[in-house]
Amino acid sequence: HEHLDDPVNRLLNALEPGTYLRPHRHLNPKKDEIFLLLRGRIAVFLFDNKGEITQTQILDPKEGVYGAEIKAGTWHGLLVLESGSVIYEIKEGPFAPLAPENFAPWSPAPEDTKGVAKYMELLGKAI
């Protein structure tokens, strides 16, 4: 997108194994989000309000699974499974940074490196 206030925000996100994107939701403001995997392999997790995994989807172009749609207000997160993974993210605009209440309180903050490592290991075992 050309401007942060465009009605649709689109971005390419290049991710490597070990990248931590804290589980979050898009509730305030409510926004659906779409991930299209262009290359690599990524696990997409959906969670309930307690942090329990309710759904796991492996995005893998080699298997013909290219995308996931996340409904507004749904807790979600990713685990990068293959080096060189690139996703195309599409979300309603205008861009708004995530408010603190949109980060999952049951997930470790990025600066908690030990907690993040343990959490990512748990996600990996859930696949």
Regions found by a protein language model. Name each.
Residues 30-50:
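Glycine- and acidic-residue-biased ligand/ion/polar-headgroup-sensing regions
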Residues 1-25:
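A short glycine-rich, His/Asp/Glu-containing loop-to-beta-strand
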Residues 34, 48-73:
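Short acidic-glycine-tyrosine-enriched beta hairpin
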Residues 12-13, 32-37, 68, 78:
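His/acidic/aromatic-lined binding-pocket segments of jelly-roll/cupin-type domains
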Residues 23-24, 44-46, 68-70, 76-81, ...:
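Short beta-strand His + acidic residue motifs that chelate non-heme Fe in jelly-roll/DSBH
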Residues 52-53, 58, 75-127:
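Double-stranded beta-helix
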